Amino acid sequence: MNDSILTIPKPRSALDFGILVLIVKTILSMSSMWHSSGMVDNILTAISVVLLVAHILSKQYNIKQLVAYAIVTVLFGVICINIGSAGLLITVITCLAIRDEDIERVVRFIFKYEFWLISIHCLVGAVSTLLGSKYYVLYHGYIRYSLGFGHANVLSAFVFNLVIMYFWLKFESLNSQDFIAVIIVELLFYRVAKTRTSLYLSVFVLLIVMIYKNKECSKLIDALAKYAVPILSLFTFVMTFLYEKGNLLSHAVDQLLTRRIGLASYAYNRLGLTIFGRDMRNFTTTWDEYYGFSGGFTFDNIYSYLLINVGIVILLLIIVVLYKVAKQGSLKNNIFILVWALYSMTEVHGLSCYMCFPILFAALVIPGSYRARERRNAIEPSI
């Protein structure tokens, strides 16, 4: 990595301070060592929202634009109230706040602060583990270390987000040393956390290599980026619908995705779909011989999560927004839309722009974001 990664940018506006507060809030909310209380989390959320809204108002948008912002915020606010989580609203407000900003500067800002804060967290977590703290779980006979985060998958998600931000920021100047360094890092964290993120990263690296060597492949990526999310959404729903009917393909996909289809089917057959979201924080599974599990519940798949928990209306909005971003024709952005779509088959972190950054591309298609669109292909200095 370039030595300039050591340089931490100074916050220079309400936007920067708001984003920094949200980075800290996100890491604390996912930490077992420094987990923030509900009150602290709410205070950090309130501070960040005030800062981001102040930045939006400082842009002196016209009444029509502000009304549109208010409508979008209210819609997502209602959804967040329905599901009992403000995470999605934070992403929306962040996207609205950076509408007229240089998105590469914003991503670089997030990358550098997350890199250092997560590195410090992992170092302290590793030392604490060596000193006897149980930041690990025994899973099918092997140990999965979380380095102080609530789950090994959370550690993996943060590392994966850093990796894809790094690739996006250095896209025009990537070299073999970058690939080797990232693969070594991912292999190391695979040994620590025992997650499949390294598999997705390997596919991603191969994808970039093919794109540089094959123009036809580039055209294919542009096409896939437009339709990946609706295709995978439909595929997930069909597999979920067929699971309880004993469909062999559905069960095979379920095994490949480590029970994610089965969990979605369990929820779907008891709750159905939702348009504007529902609160599932207290939803648990009871023993069922067909499904073979009981206890806590999680989706770990964005598409089933949106269909059954968050609301179909949000899924449709994401489909439209990412289609419009893909239609802009930026090969770099389209690669990462596809990465987001594939990664979403195994995680729900993609709805947080601070845990899976490509959702920030939504800012590029907000009406009036001309400066952002003009800059989207600009080549910035390497990080």
Briefly describe each language-model feature range.
Residues N2-M30, D41-L248, N269, G292-R375:
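Hydrophobic transmembrane helix bundles of membrane-integrated enzymes that assemble
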Residues E374-I383:
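Membrane-proximal cytoplasmic C-terminal regulatory module of class A 7TM GPCRs
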Residues L249-V310:
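Long extracytoplasmic/lumenal interhelical loops at the membrane interface
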Residues S36-M39:
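Interfacial loop-to-helix junctions that mark the boundaries of transmembrane helices
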